[in-house]
Design a protein with these regions (language model features):
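Small/polar, glycine/serine/threonine/aspartate-rich low-complexity segments that form flexible
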Residues: 1-2, 123-143, 165, 172, ...
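Transmembrane beta-barrel architecture of outer-membrane proteins
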Residues: 42, 87, 205-207, 253, ...
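Bacterial Sec-pathway N-terminal export signals of envelope proteins
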Residues: 79-82, 135-165, 215-216, 241-244, ...
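Acidic, low-complexity, intrinsically disordered peripheral segments
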Residues: 120-121, 288, 309-346
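C-terminal substrate/ligand-recognition segments
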Residues: 215-225, 251, 257, 261-272
Length: 349
């Protein structure tokens, strides 16, 4: 065994290197937690959006089928053209293709969510269409400028900070290597001869004394290593600064996306109100005999498309929150002894 005195900053550099390793491990653990929570929420939102969209596309398919039936009757009665029938047939085919695409997206998201939750198969409810599938509504964030401390919770910034600490520790070790190193060591060598029945004083050889490492013949190598460690420290500092700038840019982009999606939802709500009023007027005209059923199908289909766009906007707004969560590194940090599954308790599926 040996005991290094750790002179000339060697002991402090070793402790700093160990602390950097702990910080790096915490950053990578936090990155795994953030990725897990974000992926679970992302797949959950995909499922809910697909459930709503499938319910809307099924209702739209019924309207398309009815419109095609009425168009064929109008063509037979010389009130419509074959081109109108062809357009409605193409429209019905596009709706069927969209329905298949939504079913595929929903199934893929359901299986991925089941895998993230440690299940072998998804719940049957996740694969059904549901017009009332819950989606979070738009909410104002209420924060104009985020504190800089929130960025420190980003895993990549923590890893970059750990790299700076490690580079500084290596630079300290390389600097300490330029000076003599003092180590107090001791050992005990014991042997036993199986041909003898008695123990003798020659069976063990203890040693104890100091060891001195002097940079005499390898001074140039140690000096070059110290210079290289200094440059590595400067590179780590620059990488840390770039990580901070990238984090700020990602957070700003997420906030901009939140504002844009909020404005989009507000615009779609205004459009939906206009279409709802138009549909109400059309129904009134139909009751009074001033219009036909065929003429009222187009406004109803436009209202369904507006609802579909609003569903997409709500999901995009929720995903923007997920992007902001990832951009902030999942701030605040969870307790070290908290299991990763506890982070999923806020998500009700």
């Amino acid at each position: 065994m040996s005991w290094d005195l750790g002179l000339f900053g060697a002991r402090e550099a070793g402790e700093r290197n160990a602390a950097a390793s702990v910080l790096d491990a915490r950053g990578r653990l936090q990155a795994a937690r953030v990725a897990l929570v974000a992926d679970v929420v992302h797949r959950y939102l995909d499922i809910r959006m697909a459930q709503r969209q499938r319910a809307l596309i099924d209702e739209q398919a019924l309207l398309d089928a009815r419109a095609l039936q009425l168009a064929q009757v109008r063509q037979q009665q010389r009130l419509g053209t074959a081109e109108a029938v062809h357009q409605l047939q193409l429209q019905a085919g596009q709706s069927a293709a969209l329905r298949a695409s939504l079913r595929e997206t929903q199934a893929r998201s359901a299986h991925m969510l089941a895998a993230l939750l440690g299940r072998t198969r998804p719940d049957a409810q996740w694969l059904q269409a549901d017009a009332k599938a819950p989606l979070p509504g738009p909410q104002a964030l209420g924060v104009a400028v985020l504190p800089a401390d929130l960025l420190r919770t980003r895993p990549d910034i923590q890893v970059a900070q750990a790299a700076v600490e490690r580079a500084a520790a290596e630079q300290g070790i390389a600097h300490a290597a330029l000076y003599p190193r003092f180590v107090i060591g001791g050992s005990l060598l014991y042997s036993f001869n199986i041909t003898q029945n008695l123990r003798t004083t020659q069976d063990n050889a203890p040693t104890f004394g100091p060891q001195i490492d002097i940079p005499l013949f390898d001074w140039g190598r140690r000096r070059s290593q110290a210079d290289a460690s200094e440059l590595a420290l400067q590179a780590a500092v620059q990488a840390y600064r770039q990580s901070v700038l990238d984090g700020v840019a990602e957070v700003e982009s997420a906030l901009a996306a939140l504002d844009a999606q909020r404005e989009r939802i507000a615009s779609l709500q205004s459009t939906q109100q206009v279409l709802a009023e138009r549909e109400r007027v059309q129904d009134q005209r139909l009751k009074l005999g001033l219009d036909s059923e065929f003429g009222g199908l187009a406004p109803r289909r436009a209202a369904l498309q507006a609802r579909s766009e609003q569903t997409t906007a709500l999901a995009a707004h929720a995903l923007a929150y997920v992007a902001l969560y990832k951009a902030l590194g999942g701030a605040p940090l969870p307790a070290e002894d908290q299991d990763a599954a506890d982070s999923l308790s806020l998500i009700h599926i």
